[in-house]
């Protein structure tokens, strides 16, 4: 059953059109009429019986079919009767023909489904009371709806040995119904061939053949698509039932993609994180870091204000004392003697509040941890630092050139889009930078940034590929811009993009230039006028420094004067907190309603799922309280008022789920002429080369035991983190 779909995936042929609606043939211009239980519906030729039924709102039961995966047709649960046909047909795989009358609830259809369900349940264990899939199990629901009320099976049930495929996905393979969704997901979406089947008939098993870790940054998604309890979450095992939890729609901040998520909580604790559908960003997938790093929200948290005593030790204190100390110091300095550094997990509301606070003392010394060139157009033009084509726009591109980036681990969901387009749309991919293990074939052009200048001048062989491109896309990794020649690299890419526009038939509305960011706060910070990088602080060390969630280690105590007063405000005791003279505990992304802007410039909101631990408070509220004690009260008291202020400074920050048009590429190219354009020959090396570098990149994931287990499993093998099962 699997050979044809997997073969298609491996050779890059498509058995589905672009997007997520799939047909099995070429769509003609004329619609054809079919009938579903006597109801007329017009569909395109090649539409399957199942799709035609869904068009009129008729749900057909299925286990193996998934709208984003190839058709396997091996569970047979979707059998329906076609009027005047001798036998029932598999609705997921059979294309409709003109005039067909599909009978979804005939006696023949019901009997067929009942028979299939009986065979599925024959070997399925009665684990429902102890199965983590209970309450959201397709087999439970469909056996109730379409199965028989009694069993005729009296023999012994078969049992299958469980597989250890790592610290994230728990396997109880006796429950497996061989739908092969996990195999097709791994091969087609994740781009790894770790999963497969062995044996046949009653002896068929799904697994890795040789016991090893399921090595993918998207592996947790097999938990969602598994229709039974064969694949479940190891960290979530035996902790809660779905009906006990409260679901809060939010967004992820582990990278700059802004994946939509659902945070499940119980009694003030995050129990698990699931994906939420958003066609333009993450479809219905999320990365493993997004899904499993939530246990880091419970560890190494800052729960009370702290001050450094005479002995140099940090001790707990009250909010009044901590804020009074900070306010007293703030009143002693003004101008650029006061500075601030914003970290990667900071929300836009806190960024604008801190900006207003420092502006009140005549300081504009506001920096981000991430470096971005400010020469030429720099950050003055928004199109200069965004993924202008958008994430979904990758599906329209015909050529993608990756420069100094590894999207597989920097932005896994963006990488999944590239693979989807490569698989289905014959996308050509090339890479300039260190060779990395991507999930699709690519042409490695070399690792020197000088290749950019060769392409711009027309001397490189890749120019022939670009000449034929109608919708080329250049993706420049933000880490490539953090080198000493970052500005020259940005100019080289900008010049190359303009040359592509001149020499090819690229439409004026198509955006070629794209920057792929790695951290969630960077775009909002640049929108609000923060200076990228901390070089200005190193050159002119301040007397007072605010570290707002700054845990990247971009500045150390040795870079600052001994008498510099440091205030750390954040939610984890990570890199920044030990440097501080005063610590102000803030709220994590699951504990506040906050605005984040993703790499394509799309503003989105997190929602309050749980309350902050201990005495921790939302960041903008802490800054507002500090301003009042310091006698420079900020002009807002509520979240709505803060967002009104956001709109004054940068209106796009409150246009939620909307992308503003960016078209200032010609102006950026002209300003680039003012920049030193000499690039170094040093190779472009992305910071996240392997999957080991993917798991622990911020204060939350570094505090996560699950992420630490993943790193150990990758380096030492899945057996190194194997835990005894109680089930």
Swiss-Prot record:
GO terms for MF: 2 iron, 2 sulfur cluster binding; 4 iron, 4 sulfur cluster binding; electron transfer activity; metal ion binding; NADH dehydrogenase (ubiquinone) activity
Domain 4Fe-4S His(Cys)3-ligated-type, residue spans: 108-147
Protein's GO biological process: aerobic respiration; mitochondrial electron transport, NADH to ubiquinone; mitochondrial respiratory chain complex I assembly; proton motive force-driven mitochondrial ATP synthesis
Main location: mitochondrion
Xref: CDD domains: fer2, MopB_Res-Cmplx1_Nad11
The protein's enzyme class: translocase
Pfam families listed in its UniProt record: Fer2_4, Fer4_NDSU1, Fer4_Nqo3, Molybdopterin, NADH-G_4Fe-4S_3, NADH_dhqG_C
Family: Belongs to the complex I 75 kDa subunit family.
Function summary: Core subunit of the mitochondrial membrane respiratory chain NADH dehydrogenase (Complex I) which catalyzes electron transfer from NADH through the respiratory chain, using ubiquinone as an electron acceptor. Essential for catalysing the entry and efficient transfer of electrons within complex I. Plays a key role in the assembly and stability of complex I and participates in the association of complex I with ubiquinol-cytochrome reductase complex (Complex III) to form supercomplexes.
UniProt protein name: NADH-ubiquinone oxidoreductase 75 kDa subunit, mitochondrial
Species the sequence originates in: Mus musculus (Mouse)
